């Protein structure tokens, strides 16, 4: 993987303490933002499920992957390490949107499909577990280096 190299010891010594420059923290920051968005999406999907019988309710969703892809796509000819290190994580805000499509199974205008929502929720839970596992792995690698 491109982010296995975590630490580069800087040649500067400030006050007797060597400073460490690391892209590992950049990855952890992005993974943390992604995990936060995944957790938020789980809550939104659960809310959709709880409103399956609410007349006129329109499903909501969250688009974090699109925002991340857009931010990473700004520097097309750079390595992933470089893109991540230059990424402004404050711009990685998940966008919650309401699905106003006219497609609905029911006469009451509710557009929540319980089967789709359950599949999306299960998928999001797996994604969240993978993200938190990745964050934990990053810290384990840093700990072993130190």
Regions found by a protein language model. Name each.
Residues 14-146:
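Amphipathic alpha-helical polymerization modules
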């Amino acid at each position: 993987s491109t982010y296995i190299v975590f630490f580069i010891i800087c040649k500067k010594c400030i006050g007797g303490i060597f400073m460490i420059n690391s892209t590992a923290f950049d990855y952890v920051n992005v993974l943390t933002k992604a995990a936060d968005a995944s957790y938020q999406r789980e809550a939104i999907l659960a809310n959709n499920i709880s409103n399956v019988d609410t007349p006129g309710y329109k499903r909501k969703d969250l688009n974090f992957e699109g925002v991340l892809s857009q931010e990473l796509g700004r520097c097309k000819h750079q390595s992933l390490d470089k893109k991540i290190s230059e990424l402004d994580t404050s711009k990685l805000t998940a966008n919650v949107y309401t699905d106003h499509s006219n497609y609905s199974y029911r006469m009451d205008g509710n557009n929540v499909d319980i089967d789709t929502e359950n599949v999306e929720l299960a998928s999001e839970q797996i994604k969240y577990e993978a993200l938190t596992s990745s964050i934990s792995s990053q810290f384990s690698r840093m700990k072993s280096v130190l």
